[in-house]
Structure formats: structure tokens, C-alpha cells
Amino acid sequence: MKEPWPDAHQRQLAVASVQESLPELDWTLHPAKVKRFSQDFHWFSPILKAQLKEKQADAVVRPRTESELRKLVSACVAHGLPLMMRGAATGNYGQLVPLQGGIMVDMSGFNHICQQREGILRAQAGIRLGEIEKSARATGWELRCMPSTYRQATLGGLFS
């Protein structure tokens, strides 16, 4: 039976190929930084801390536009690379931790309110909930769902 994901060596080659084809993207390859971006607060749990200790992405990429994001996703699919989306990593259950390596997509560059009118707000996935709350309150509205980490948590992370 074929493994669903490439092994570590195949992933390294695939990541290098994707990086070479998309040099305009903001890449992070330094091992300590990649490790940090591959973690949430799962280490609060001694069980998850042990289970996820060695798990991390092979690279982190921060796209700045939808076009860059589309190109990145297409390249990862073409190479069979796992792809994980990262908001602010405020969760504590290990949902963001890459189990099979791959590319971590830092969505922090997607942090704008696109449209706001009475009772409706459309925003990008990387915007912090605190910013949405501030903008909503200025117009007499408020968020209906307020996690304890709302000042740091992102819209995309809340709904993923």
C-alpha cells in the first residue's frame, strides 16, 4: 500500500522545488522558527506534549495576496505536499501541529476587513478577533462568540 504522503526526503525535495518555483513568497526555513510556527499551546497537556513533540512542518510560508496563496496551494497539490493553515496558534489541542511535515501557511498577512455594513462584516482569515470586535463596537455591534483568546485569536482559526 502506498503511503498517503511523501517521506521526509521526498518532502525536502518537494519543498525545495516549490520554493524554487515561488521565490517571491516570504519563506521561513530556519529550523527553530519552523518548529515555533508548528506549535500551538498543546504542551499544556502532558499527553499531547509527548505525542506531538517531534512533529513539525518542513517550511513556513507567509503569502501576502490571494494570487500567491493560490499558486502555493496549486504547487503543494502538484507535489503531494501536506499543507496546514496557521492563524495565531492560540488553540491548545494540537489541531495546528503538522503530523506529516509539509508546508505551514502563516495567514497573518491576510488581516484586513474587506467590507462592513450594518450587522455584516466580511474579513480575511488572518485578522484578529480583537480587531473585528473593535470595528464592530464602533458601529454599535459586537461579536456573538468571544473566546478567551479573542485579542490574539484569528477569524480563520476560530472557524477551522
Q: Positions of the model-derived regions?
A:
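FAD-binding core of FAD-dependent oxidoreductases
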Residues: 34, 79-160
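N-terminal flexible segment immediately upstream of the FAD-binding catalytic core
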Residues: 1-74, 90-119, 148
